[in-house]
A protein has these predicted regions:
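Short, polar/charged alpha-helical segment
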Residues: 59-85, 184, 188, 271-275
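Short, low-complexity disordered leader/linker segments with a strong preference
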Residues: 1-51, 575-581
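Hinge/lid segment of periplasmic solute-binding proteins
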Residues: 117-182, 188, 203-223, 299, ...
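C-terminal capping/gating helix-and-loop segments adjacent to ligand/active sites or protein-protein/ligand interfaces
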Residues: 480, 502-581
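Glycine-centered hinge/linker elements that transmit conformational signals in sensory
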Residues: 244-246, 283-366, 424
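Extracytoplasmic "Venus flytrap"
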Residues: 46-48, 52-68, 179
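Extracytoplasmic/periplasmic substrate-recognition and gating elements
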Residues: 85, 165-169, 225-226, 383-384, ...
Length: 581
C-alpha cells in the first residue's frame, strides 16, 4: 500500500510546461555587446580574443560538459591567431530546449549549434549550414584521426547526404550525443531484497537455499573481450520474468516503478519503441525507415484484418516482401505487438507505480529526487521504488539532487550511490535464445556550423573538430555519465573512476548494436513528421499514445486491440500515400 502521496502545486505544472517548451532568443546580445554565457560570472567577455558563439540544446545532458570542453579548447589554442590583432579564442554558449528552422539558423548570431531533433535535410538543402566535409575527412589536429573513421555506415550515409548510388559524401552536420529511454534500477534495493532471478529451472528469486543468479538477458556471465557479461546476472531475461519480479516486489512492500508524472506518457512511449527495437533488431527496424525489403516476423491476420491468427495461444508469424504496394504491413511486426503487451501489463496495474505516476503536476525532477532518496534516511516517505523510467542521461540531469544529498552525507554522492542501466528483457524465450541487444537512439542529436561565417569561421570549425576528438569524447562521458554517438573507446582512467551506473551503461553499449532513428530515404524525409518515434505509434489510435490508451482501456482494451487498430489506420492511408515508397 502506498503511504505518502506528494502533492505538487499547479504552479509546478506551469513551470514544467514552461521548461518543456521554452525557447532561447536567437543570439540576443548581452549588455556588453557579446553573445552567450552572460550568466557565467567567471567567464567575462574578452574582446582581445576571437569569439565563437555556441547554442546548445540544454535539456537532460545539461551543459557542464560544454563548459569543460570550451575551457580545454581555449587552453589548447591560447596562442592561436585566428584574426589579425587578436590572440587566442573564447567560446561562450547559451541554451534551452528548442528546435531550429532554417531561417532561425540563418538569422541567429550563433556560430555552432548542438541540436536535438530538427530536420537536418531541410537545413542542409536551405543553405543554412556550412559544408564541413573537409573537417570530417581530414586527420584531426587533436587526435590525428578522421571524424569519419569514428562513424558507422548509416551515419556516413545520413550525415554525408548519400541518398543513392554514386552520390558523393558532403557533410553539413555530425553526430552529437547518444541517448536511449530505458529502466534504471536501484542496485542497493535489489541487493537488500535479493531481487534477482535465480538459475533454477522454474522462475524464482535467489534465496539462502539457492543464491546463484541466472545469466540475465544476455545469457552470458564472466568477462570476455572487454565486456563484463556478469553485470546483468539475475536481471529478468524475459517479459514474464520481469513481471514475476514486479509481483515479488509488491509482496515485499516495494513499488516496482517510479514514473515521472508530467513526462510518463512521453517516456514510456519511447520505452515502447526501445522494446520494439530490441525485438526486431537493426535490419527489421530499418524497414520502418525505408519500407522496402524482406519482413521476417509479421503477425498473421485473418482475411479482413480484424483478428490475429494464433496457434497454441501465440500469434502465427509470417514473412513478406515490403514495397510500395504494402508498406503498411510493417505495422504488423511482432515486436510492436509484444511491446504493446509489455506496456499494457506495466501501466494497467496501479500498484506497480507511484501515485503521482501520471500526475501532470509531478515532474521528472520530482521523480528523480524521490527515486534517488528512496530507501535512504533522507526520504520523506517510507515508500521504496526499485526502478525508474528515464533516459540514459538521467544522472547528468539529476546532478543537483545528488550534490545536495552529498553535502549532508558523502555516502549519498553520485560516485558512491549504486544505480544501474537495466538490460531490457526479451519478449519470450525464443528471442532470449537469439541473444541480440539493440540500443535505440531516438534523439536525432547533431552538431553543425552556420554557413557564411566571417573571421571566426576557422575557430568555429576547429572547435567542432575538437569536440569530436577522442579526448573530448572521453571527457563528455566522464562529465555526463552518458555517451557520444561515435565509435570511441572510453579511457581506462575514466572507466575505472566511473560510478556503477556509468559502468553498466558503457558495458551495455559495448555488447549492443545501436539503431539510430533517422533516415535519408525519400519516403521517410517526405513523411518524417508522421514517422518519428514520438509520433508514428500515436496517430493510428486516438486520442493519445499507446501508454494512456492502454492504461485507460477505452479506445483499446488490450494490446491486440490496439495493434489491430493501428495497423488498420496505416493501411487506410491508401495507395496514394504508400505508392511514394
Amino acid at each position: 500500500m502506498k503511504k505518502n502521496k506528494l502533492f505538487t502545486s499547479v504552479l509546478a505544472a506551469g513551470i514544467a510546461l514552461t521548461s518543456a517548451f521554452s525557447v532561447v532568443g536567437c543570439g540576443r546580445p548581452n549588455p556588453d555587446g557579446s553573445h552567450g554565457d552572460s550568466g557565467r560570472a567567471d567567464k567575462p567577455y574578452d574582446n582581445t580574443k576571437t569569439q565563437v558563439q555556441i547554442w546548445t540544446y540544454n535539456a537532460g545532458f545539461k551543459d557542464e560538459w560544454l563548459y569543460q570542453l570550451e575551457a580545454d579548447f581555449e587552453e589548447a589554442n591560447k596562442d592561436t591567431v585566428y584574426e589579425a590583432g587578436k590572440k587566442g579564442v573564447q567560446v561562450r554558449h547559451e541554451g534551452a530546449m528548442k528546435e531550429w528552422s532554417s531561417d532561425d539558423i540563418k538569422n541567429s548570431n550563433f556560430d555552432v549549434f548542438f541540436m536535438e531533433g530538427g530536420d537536418y535535410y531541410a537545413w542542409r538543402q536551405s543553405g543554412a549550414l556550412e559544408d564541413i566535409t573537409s573537417l570530417v575527412t581530414s586527420n584531426s589536429a587533436y587526435d590525428n584521426k578522421t571524424i569519419r573513421s569514428k562513424m558507422n555506415d548509416k551515419q556516413i550515409a545520413y550525415f554525408g547526404g548519400v541518398t543513392g548510388e554514386g552520390v558523393q559524401e558532403k557533410y553539413y552536420a555530425l553526430p552529437h550525443y547518444k541517448g536511449a529511454m530505458g529502466l534504471i534500477y536501484n542496485v542497493e534495493i535489489f541487493d537488500e531484497y535479493g531481487f534477482y532471478i535465480s538459475d533454477s529451472e522454474t522462475t524464482s528469486l535467489i534465496s539462502a537455499s539457492n543464491p546463484n543468479k541466472s545469466k540475465g538477458p544476455d545469457g552470458k556471465t564472466g568477462k570476455e573481450n572487454g565486456i563484463d557479461y556478469s553485470m546483468d546476472d539475475g536481471l529478468p531475461a524475459t517479459y514474464d520474468e520481469f513481471f514475476y519480479l514486479c509481483g515479488q516486489m509488491l509482496k515485499r512492500g516495494v513499488t516496482p516503478f517510479m514514473l515521472p508524472g508530467f513526462y510518463s506518457d512521453y517516456y514510456i512511449n519511447i520505452l515502447y519503441n526501445a522494446l520494439v527495437t530490441e525485438y526486431e533488431g537493426i535490419d527489421q527496424m530499418e524497414l520502418n525507415m525505408s519500407f522496402k525489403g524482406n519482413a521476417t516476423d509479421l503477425i498473421k491476420l485473418n482475411s479482413d484484418g480484424t483478428a490475429i491468427v494464433k496457434k497454441n495461444g501465440e500469434p502465427v508469424i509470417e514473412s513478406a516482401t515490403i514495397d510500395y504496394t504494402n508498406g503498411y504491413d510493417v505495422f504488423r511486426q511482432a515486436g510492436k505487438y509484444y511491446a504493446l503487451d509489455f506496456v499494457k501489463r506495466m501501466v494497467s496495474k496501479e500498484d506497480y507505480y507511484n501515485e503521482d505516476g501520471f500526475n501532470t503536476a509531478f515532474t521528472q525532477t520530482d521523480a528523480q529526487e524521490m527515486f534517488i532518496k528512496s530507501g535512504t534516511d533522507m526520504s520523506v516517505s517510507d515508500e521504496r521504488y526499485a526502478m525508474y523510467v528515464d533516459g540514459s542521461w538521467w544522472e547528468a540531469e539529476a546532478n543537483i539532487i545528488f550534490n545536495n544529498m552529498a553535502k549532508k552525507d558523502s555516502k549519498y554522492s553520485k560516485q558512491n550511490r549504486k544505480f544501474g542501466w537495466m538490460s531490457l528483457p526479451k519478449a519470450n524465450k525464443l528471442k532470449f535464445e537469439e541473444g541480440n541487444s539493440v540500443f535505440l537512439d531516438s534523439l536525432e542529436a547533431a552538431v553543425c556550423v552556420k554557413a557564411n561565417l566571417g573571421a571566426n569561421k576557422k575557430a568555429a570549425l576547429d572547435f567542432v573538430q575538437y569536440v569530436c576528438s577522442d579526448g573530448a569524447l572521453d571527457k563528455f562521458t566522464d562529465v555526463t555519465h552518458a555517451l557520444k554517438d561515435f565509435n570511441y573507446e572510453v579511457s581506462k582512467e575514466t572507466y575505472d573512476n566511473a560510478n556503477y551506473f556509468t559502468k553498466t551503461l558503457i558495458n551495455y553499449n559495448k555488447k549492443s548494436e545501436t539503431f539510430s532513428y533517422y533516415s535519408n530515404t525519400p519516403f521517410y524525409l517526405k513523411n518524417r513528421s508522421d514517422l518519428l518515434p514520438t509520433k508514428v505509434n500515436t496517430i493510428g489510435v486516438q486520442p493519445g499514445t499507446p501508454v494512456t490508451i492502454l492504461k485507460d482501456g477505452v479506445s483499446a482494451k488490450s494490446a491486440e486491440d490496439y495493434f489491430l487498430k493501428s495497423y488498420a489506420y496505416w493501411k487506410k492511408r491508401g495507395s496514394a500515400f504508400w505508392k511514394e515508397v
